Amino acid sequence: MALDQRWDRFLVSWFGLDEAQLTAHRVFEGENGVPVEEYVAFVIFGERGFQGNMPSWARHLLDRPSLAQAIAVLRAGSDTVAKQAQICAAQQLLGAHVWVVVTLSRAQAADHARAIPRHVWAKYLSLPFSKACAQLCKLLALCSRFPLVTCCSKPPPSLPWLRKKWHGPLPRRPLLEVPSPTRRGVAATEDGNGLGIGAADTGLREALERVAPTVPCGNPFDAMLGSLCFLSLIKSRHVVLPACEQEGPGLVRNLGRRLLAYNVLSPCVSIPVICSRVARAALAKRARCARAVVCMECGHCLNFGRGKFHTVNFPPTNVFFSRDRKEKQFTICATTGRIYCSYCGSEHMRVYPLCDITGRGTLARVVIRAVLANNAALAIRDLDQTVSFVVPCLGTPDCEAALLKHRDVRGLLQLTSQLLEFCCGKCSS
């Protein structure tokens, strides 16, 4: 069933409107009609749903001082439309908005609130579109506004709530308990040396078993849910995050912080390749070039960048990970053999070659990555700012060394103008 037909049935069943009147004055048909798919995106994301290419009908709904004027332009291209046609068009536009709200939130309005008199629909014609949507949702006791999702186009480092730490209460998640080790099997009666346990030791052990039948194990379900959600969301093209740090339960806040860190924090900068000799040398070194191991959550490089370097100031780093051990490297678990980041504890890592190719076919280009000492590549704003970074050695095909450079950002962008800048002392001699 087409979406506009589903909306008509929704209006008839919910508000008791005349289906014949709705069919006679359709607003989602014709050359000047509103496309149903675009209208759904408009209701959810507003102007941001069109990514800068907003159609004329959406512009009329937002800019006209009243819904009646917007409908008049949509229906006839002028300011004169019959009153009944205006009311039917308003019922379709506002009713479709309510349908989207009810479908996404699974909310239900009271039966007595659905019987909307004709004069109330006529009143909505004198209001702007956004205010008419808010008034109708308020009448139906639906907690909603237009648009449903507020899109913020500001860069994440400029958001005010990213410049302060979270000092609120820690979320209290229900903890699980499992049977103690002695209740999972037969307890040993001898120690490792083959010596028996005395009567006093046996009594002490039995007393401890009685008072501690279970042991806490945290909440593995929350940990599993958070891990699965994070891995799923980083593969999505669009993700909706909480508007501020204080909203949502602890798991939601943690996911929002991890997603922002995944998309914002990075130590790598792609240097534009200017010289053809540098491009050929980088292509030849793809298999043997130096590599950077980057934690995908805190954004730190774990094999470069330790010591005293010129770093980029990045205040939001304290929001994502407040602790700083001054040591970005690997931590290997002696029990399981898993490798963790010593800074944030994550095991989600990725290896980036410092010489690589991006794109395919005619869009392929050579990329040389420069690795900063911290995770603030996004915060570089000033061309005169001095930074420390690591680049690969391109001297000989067998050399896997990396070079430490101290340059300003302008010099970093012009570094590939000559091959000599990418030769270590051994290769240049």
From Swiss-Prot:
InterPro entries from the entry? UL49
Query: Is Isomerase a UniProt keyword of this protein?
Result: no
Is-annotated flag, keyword Zinc? no
Report which superkingdom the organism of origin falls in: Viruses
Q: Where are the transmembrane segments?
A: none
Any one of the GO BP annotations:
viral process
User: Which compartment or compartments is the protein found in?
Assistant: Host nucleus; Host cytoplasm
Summary of the knockout phenotype: Deletion mutant shows mainly attenuated late gene expression and decreased virus production while viral DNA replication remains unaffected.
Q: Name one GO cellular component term.
A: host cell nucleus
Task: Please tell me where this protein is predominantly located.
Answer: host cell
Which factors induce or repress this protein, as stated in its UniProt record? Expressed during the early stages of lytic infection.
Keyword set, alphabetical order: Host cytoplasm, Host nucleus
Indicate the family of this protein: Belongs to the herpesviridae UL49 family.
Tell me the function of this protein. Participates in the expression of late viral mRNAs.
**What do we know about how this protein assembles, alone or with others?**
Interacts with ORF34.
**What is the protein name stated in its UniProt record?**
Protein ORF66
Q: What is the lineage of its organism?
A: Viruses, Duplodnaviria, Heunggongvirae, Peploviricota, Herviviricetes
